[in-house]
Regions:
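A broadly used, surface-exposed interaction patch
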Residues: 54-76
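GIY-YIG nuclease catalytic motif and its immediate N-terminal context
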Residues: 1-50, 55-58, 79-98
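Eukaryotic N-terminal accessory cofactor-binding modules
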Residues: 101-102
């Protein structure tokens, strides 16, 4: 399944939703954390990592994700290199203003 997003950088297609840490790619990329609201995925956090599979299970905001989502958050991933992932993360923070991870 795909989650399509739109930012000032253009359109992006994230894969997911991943609900199990074993499904996460051990690669560089951007991740969106979402919750379901009336059947639609609402972005609650955005991040980037050199290894998404390592980052998500040990993330310091996981307690926020669980609190905001009722312990039912979803992870969506977009694989990309370091330079692109930082730009894409910033663009998504601006476009979606997620409730978790104030920067």
């Amino acid at each position: 399944m795909a989650l399509n997003t739109k930012t000032q950088l253009g359109n992006h297609q994230f894969t997911g939703p991943h609900t199990n840490a074993d499904e996460l790619p051990d690669r560089s990329g951007v991740y969106l954390i979402t919750r379901l609201v009336d059947g639609l995925h609402e972005v609650i956090d955005v991040g980037e990592s050199h290894n998404i599979a390592e980052r998500i299970p040990s993330h310091d905001r996981m307690f926020q994700w669980n609190a905001v989502s009722g312990n039912a958050f979803h992870v969506w991933t977009l694989l990309t290199d370091e330079a692109q992932r930082m730009l894409i993360e910033r663009a998504h923070r601006l476009a979606y203003n997620p409730v978790c991870g104030e920067r």
